[in-house]
Amino acid sequence: MHRYSQKTGPRWIRCALLWINGLFPFLWPLRHLLRNFNYPRGIGLFFRDYATYRRKNQDPRFPIRLVDSFPCLFDRFEASGIKPRHYFHQDWWAAKKVFESKVSEHFDFGSRIDGFVAHCSVFCKVQVFDIRPLPPLNANITFIQSDITRLEHVADSSIRSLSSLHVFEHLGLGRYGDPVGSEMLQNAVNEVTRVLAAGGEFYFSVPIGIQRLEFNGQRVFAVRTVLDMYRDLKLIEFSAIDDRDELHIAADPETFDEAEYSCGLFHFRK
């Protein structure tokens, strides 16, 4: 059985590079510093949130360790943005799924606006929930600023088509100014299960591979962890983007157990 993995050297080297990227984002590119004056504040908030998460952590699957940290010191001060890796294949995969379902309205939790959401807005209305602000874009995109771990304004079993792409790995880590705590991940999973209608489709993606917490950037999930999280939903398809950024449709989940940083694409149905 072929396993998709790409070794990137000792973990401490990766950690050091991520810290350099987090502390000195103006090195790549320099213009980041010139337009962002929240540098000292971001450092302080990282350590505040690290201490809060460490004190409140009740999830033994993701122990918090400084050596695995992935400091994201500016994201909380920015509007919903753009990240390159995984996103082209991920957004194409999910938008194709929504298009083929022929729904007239789709709901999304925090996915990339200028990729997946824009694709879907061509052929259906999209209602977007995100904790960060979003300016008006076009008539087919409706935005509600909301915490997806607490969707009190969304009725039970009310959504037939739902997505959240490259979002859940960040929940509870404070990266985007969201509440800090390990319970936020499960809270969001519970909300998805609650609001999804019977027969409803859920398109979901997160980083997959060797499971770890890279505070305060993200989690990387074992595929089995994701399947356990959504045990109340039926898995329709598992596809993945490997460490070399190549897309594999209808992949074998076991081949990604040793991946370093791949992306799992999950199609669930309630």
Predicted features along the sequence, with ranges:
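Conserved N-terminal segment of class I S-adenosyl-L-methionine
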Residues: G9-L151, A155-S157, L165
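Soluble or luminal CAZymes and related metallo-dependent hydrolases
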Residues: G42, H86-Q90, M184-A188, Q218-A222, ...
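Short conserved AdoMet
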Residues: S121, A197, R231
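A conserved beta-strand element that flanks and buttresses the S-adenosyl-L-methionine
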Residues: S163, F168, G172
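A short glycine-rich, Lys/Arg-flanked "PGG" loop and its adjoining helix->strand segment in the class I
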Residues: V180-A198
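Conserved beta-strand signature within the Rossmann-like core of class I S-adenosyl-L-methionine
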Residues: G199-P207
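Class I S-adenosyl-L-methionine
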Residues: V223-K270
